[in-house]
């Protein structure tokens, strides 16, 4: 089910990430540092538990979850959110909710790449990863 995502991925391109972070409410200084980071994403599966770890010079974060089960998450910019991740059409779709707001993060395979689309209101950021 999630096996296509398993592995270590390195960021190779990022479009519109600053505008997305601004829409989410991330402060200027944090946006500048986070925007320069080139994170590796490590995805693993153990039974029905999926773990996504992001490692960069900016910050390391890790979430472990079961598909379709809501969990508490502290994001890289320190937002406390409720997240739920589902598998939809071969994509891992994450919805984060906090303070009456929500954002969607869709992770999908495209050939040998992992494409992450982050959407907040009308702002979309696309980040592309390749296997490390």
Curated annotation (Swiss-Prot):
The modification Phosphoserine is found at residue 13. Keywords: Acetylation, Cytoplasm, Lipid-binding, Nucleus, Phosphoprotein, Transport. Lipid transport protein in adipocytes. Binds both long chain fatty acids and retinoic acid. Delivers long-chain fatty acids and retinoic acid to their cognate receptors in the nucleus. This is Fatty acid-binding protein, adipocyte. Changing residue 87 to A: Abolishes export from nucleus. A fatty acid binds at residues 127-129. Signal peptide: none annotated. Monomer. Homodimer. Interacts with PPARG. A motif (Nuclear localization signal) lies at residues 22-32. Belongs to the calycin superfamily. Fatty-acid binding protein (FABP) family. GO terms for cellular component: cytoplasm; nucleoplasm; nucleus. PANTHER family: FATTY ACID BINDING PROTEIN. It comes from Mus musculus (Mouse). GO terms for molecular function: hormone receptor binding; long-chain fatty acid binding; long-chain fatty acid transmembrane transporter activity. The modification N-acetylcysteine is found at residue 2. The modification Phosphotyrosine is found at residue 20. Forms a beta-barrel structure that accommodates the hydrophobic ligand in its interior. It is found in: Cytoplasm; Nucleus. GO terms for biological process: brown fat cell differentiation; cellular response to lithium ion; cellular response to tumor necrosis factor; cholesterol homeostasis; long-chain fatty acid transport; negative regulation of DNA-templated transcription; positive regulation of cold-induced thermogenesis; positive regulation of inflammatory response.
């Amino acid at each position: 089910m999630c096996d296509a995502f398993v592995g270590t991925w390195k960021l190779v391109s990022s479009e519109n990430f600053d505008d997305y972070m601004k829409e989410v409410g991330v402060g200027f200084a944090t946006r500048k540092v986070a925007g320069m980071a080139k994170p590796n994403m490590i995805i693993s599966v153990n039974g029905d538990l999926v773990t996504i770890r992001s490692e960069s010079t900016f910050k390391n974060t890790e979430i472990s979850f079961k598909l379709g089960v809501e969990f508490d998450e502290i994001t890289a910019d320190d937002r406390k959110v409720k997240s739920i991740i589902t598998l939809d059409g071969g994509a891992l779709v994450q919805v984060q909710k906090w303070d009456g707001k929500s954002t969607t993060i869709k992770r999908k395979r495209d050939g040998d790449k992992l494409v992450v689309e982050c959407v907040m209101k009308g702002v979309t950021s696309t980040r592309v990863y390749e296997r490390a």
